[in-house]
UniProtKB/Swiss-Prot annotation:
One BP term from GO: tRNA wobble guanine modification
Similarity field: Belongs to the archaeosine tRNA-ribosyltransferase family.
Catalytic residue positions: D87
Name of the featured protein: tRNA-guanine(15) transglycosylase
Superkingdom, taxonomy of origin: Archaea
Enzymatic reactions: guanosine(15) in tRNA + 7-cyano-7-deazaguanine = 7-cyano-7-carbaguanosine(15) in tRNA + guanine
Root EC class: transferase
Length: 410
């Protein structure tokens, strides 16, 4: 492995860590801005100044001007000295069904231009039959083995298989045997585009909780502020987003809890400009793109702070109440993945639990604590409810904590 991954803090199955590669470091969870190498709504220098020291661009698009890129090298070509990851063209394969490049060619090209992290030409299987997805997975695994023999960059090990969980687990089993640097879960974008977040949680939630913690996990195509906290809590470390730029072209404004159209806003500020003022400005696409990327940066940085404070579940549940698709995805996770989640939970935490209704009562850390409480002699319970975590620190306003917890002990 070329990457060194060190975990510093944990909460739920989420973790704050550091990835070190080629003398460069990123702190996880981390979001890679997706860069169009030939047309940038937001210049790369500004992205760097905003605190992003790793980006993703597309090797398949770069290949169309391969002589120039190979001559300069990817870092000089883009003017970026941080970690550069290249995607292989798998997204274009998902969109268009076919691309005019072979796996061997894209691996060789990524070697020649000097990427830090690279990808194989894996095959997404969204919308395919089980047998088709199985065949695609076999090809993907063969391509990965070929790439490992060729690549001089840190390599992602793709875990494909679409909705077929046994295929996803087969991919994980095979990929974990190989000398890869990052577990990369693909085939996510179609679910994101259709807001099928509960379906996504059912497909990749169990998988995330079973992935070994020795290497970071990248959820390709997932990078919305409303959704990231839940999947961090399940164990994801890396995300990426082109939405900051794509949304800007459509005059869509990212916020931590939902996306708005510029035409529907009046008094809200986007950077230093009122929405009513921004509507008539020539450079509004640039301003919105910068605003959107700042929202994403602040979100991922805030998530890291919440993990350090042991408040990640509080935030996941706050987010769940912002949209039905997130609510039911969160409820599914808490109801059905408890046995896996509790294996990752810290035994005690620095802060109390914020009561927010039924989802709070389903939290894996609280359920585990109640399980342990039930094993005690009744004479010990009152003292435990007064002082022990999480009961003594439970944040429930003016309600009587003992009466609240007694109903769980019947």
């Amino acid at each position: 492995m070329k990457i060194k991954f060190e975990i510093k803090y944990k909460d739920a199955a989420g973790k704050v860590g550091k990835i070190k590669l080629n003398g460069k470091t990123i702190e996880t969870p981390y979001l890679f801005p997706v860069i169009n190498p030939f047309k940038q709504e937001l210049p790369i220098k500004e992205i760097k100044k905003m605190g992003f020291n790793a980006i993703i661009t597309n090797a398949y698009i770069l290949f169309k001007r391969k002589e120039e890129v190979m001559e300069k090298g990817i870092h000089n070509f883009l003017g970026f000295d941080g970690i550069i990851e290249t995607d292989s063209g798998a997204y274009q394969l998902l969109q268009y069904g076919d691309i005019d490049i072979e796996n061997e060619d894209i691996i060789y090209f990524q070697n020649e231009i000097g990427v830090d992290i690279g990808n194989i030409l894996d095959i997404p299987s969204y919308g395919k039959t089980y047998e088709e997805a199985k065949k695609d997975l076999e090809i993907t695994l063969e391509r990965l083995k070929q790439a490992i023999e060729m690549a001089n960059f840190a390599i992602n090990g793709p875990i494909q298989g679409d909705k077929y969980l046994d295929l996803r687990y087969k991919a994980l089993e095979e990929v974990s045997k190989l000398d890869i640097d990052i577990y990369a879960i693909g085939g996510i974008v179609p679910y994101m585009n259709q807001y099928k977040i509960e379906s996504l949680a059912k497909i990749i939630g169990p998988l995330l909780l079973d992935i070994p913690r020795d290497r970071p996990v990248h959820l390709f195509g997932l990078g919305h502020p409303l959704i990231m906290p839940l999947f961090v809590a399940l164990g994801a470390d890396l995300f990426d987003s082109a939405s900051y730029s794509l949304f800007a072209k459509e005059e869509r404004i990212l916020t931590p809890f939902r996306t708005f159209r510029l035409e529907d806003l009046t008094d809200s500020y986007i950077l230093d400009y009122k929405a009513s003022e921004l509507k008539g400005m020539e450079n509004k696409t640039y301003i919105i793109a910068k605003h959107n990327l700042l929202v994403l940066r602040n979100e991922i940085n805030f998530i890291r702070d919440l993990i350090r404070q042991n408040r990640l579940w509080d935030y996941v549940i706050i987010k769940a109440h912002a949209h039905p698709s997130i609510y039911f995805a969160t409820k599914y996770v808490l109801e059905n993945l408890y046995e896996k989640l509790k294996e990752h939970e810290p035994i005690t935490k620095r802060v109390g639990i914020l009561y927010q209704g039924e989802l709070t009562e389903l939290r894996s850390d609280l359920r585990y604590a109640i399980e342990q409480l039930k094993k005690l002699d009744k004479s010990q319970i009152n003292d435990i409810l007064d002082y022990a975590w999480p009961f003594g620190q439970f944040e429930i306003g003016e309600k009587d904590k003992k009466l609240f917890f007694q109903r769980f002990l019947k």
